[in-house]
């Protein structure tokens, strides 16, 4: 499983 989170 892979999780990508990005907030800018």
Swiss-Prot record:
Subcellular location: Secreted
Secretion signal, residue range per the UniProt entry: none
GO terms under cellular component: extracellular region
Keyword set, alphabetical order: Antibiotic, Antimicrobial, Bacteriocin, Secreted
GO biological-process terms attached to the record: defense response to bacterium; killing of cells of another organism
Function: Narrow spectrum bacteriocin, active against closely related bacterial species.
Name of the protein this chain belongs to: Bacteriocin
Organism: Rhizobium leguminosarum bv. viciae
């Amino acid at each position: 499983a892979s999780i990508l989170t990005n907030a800018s």
